[in-house]
């Protein structure tokens, strides 16, 4: 996890707020470092984590986790981490050659119109039996992949609403979801993605949006992060700040716009 980011957001593994839905998004930049931050953050907090890895293998997240000081392998072996490896389980789901829990969760790959009930049941069964672990946490990297697989934005938003009602409201846990906005998306895909992002922004309590610098590439500044906070359940976002950042091998640095040594 990144101590500087914890300081900016006034959070720590010992004092984080339960019941929050955190939305991560990016454009012309890579917000994956935030996924790794929150994965290590909640594992350090002792939470039961259900991680839907739809774009990378378990070994990728494990290697990054090692650099951040957490062992995903140990967390999975002791039951603290439930990891759905989408790249691996999707093959069995499509070919119907595997009936494991992971492939059943991805049954929508065979029939996208069937919806995401199987995926929700996987999340529900993974987190409702948290045992002695801390509050349950759902992390998804990245949700927008489902659009490219033929699932409608409406079906995805229904899925997140069910997850939020179960994880955040009923179980008083947290959710972290990443969505990506690619410049080269087709018109239909872009329309679905815009609908998905608007719906998720309406649902979430905290939004972190990563994008490239307006001035272009800079070796010492990798991008900027816009942060929106919402205080109450039905309130509009009442606080907004922009920070610039640089990602390191074992962390990230954050600073107010214009205060980096690269621009002074």
From Swiss-Prot:
Q: What is any one GO biological process for this UniProt entry?
A: tRNA wobble uridine modification
Q: Pfam families given for it? A: ELP6
Arranged from A to Z, the UniProt key words for this protein are:
Cytoplasm, Nucleus, tRNA processing
The record's listing under CDD domains reads: Elp6 (cd19495)
The primary location reported for this protein is cytoplasm
Coiled coil (residue ranges): none
Q: What function does the entry list?
A: Component of the elongator complex which is required for multiple tRNA modifications, including mcm5U (5-methoxycarbonylmethyl uridine), mcm5s2U (5-methoxycarbonylmethyl-2-thiouridine), and ncm5U (5-carbamoylmethyl uridine). The elongator complex catalyzes formation of carboxymethyluridine in the wobble base at position 34 in tRNAs.
The molecule here is called Elongator complex protein 6
């Amino acid at each position: 996890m990144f101590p500087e980011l914890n300081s900016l957001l006034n959070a720590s593994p010992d004092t984080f707020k339960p019941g929050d839905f955190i939305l991560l998004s990016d454009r012309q930049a890579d917000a994956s470092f935030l996924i790794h931050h929150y994965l290590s953050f909640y594992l350090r907090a002792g939470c039961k984590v259900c991680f839907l890895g739809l774009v990378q293998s378990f070994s990728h997240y494990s290697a990054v986790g090692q650099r951040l000081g957490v062992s995903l392998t140990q967390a999975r072996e002791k039951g603290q981490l439930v990891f759905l490896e989408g790249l691996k389980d999707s093959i069995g789901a499509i070919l119907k050659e595997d009936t494991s829990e992971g492939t059943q969760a991805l049954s929508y790959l065979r029939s996208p119109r069937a919806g995401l009930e199987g995926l929700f049941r996987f999340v529900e069964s993974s987190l409702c039996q948290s045992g002695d672990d801390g509050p349950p946490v759902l992390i998804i990297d990245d949700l927008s992949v489902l659009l490219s697989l033929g699932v409608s934005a409406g079906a995805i938003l229904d899925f997140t609403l069910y997850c939020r009602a179960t994880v955040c409201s009923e179980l008083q846990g947290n959710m972290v979801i990443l969505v990506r906005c690619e410049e080269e998306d087709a018109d239909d895909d872009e329309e679905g993605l815009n609908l998905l992002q608007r719906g998720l922004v309406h649902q979430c309590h905290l939004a972190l949006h990563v994008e490239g610098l307006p001035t272009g590439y800079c070796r010492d500044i990798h991008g900027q992060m816009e942060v929106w906070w919402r205080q109450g359940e039905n309130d509009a976002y009442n606080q907004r700040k922009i920070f610039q950042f640089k990602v390191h091998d074992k962390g990230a640095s954050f600073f107010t716009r214009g205060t980096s040594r690269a621009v002074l």
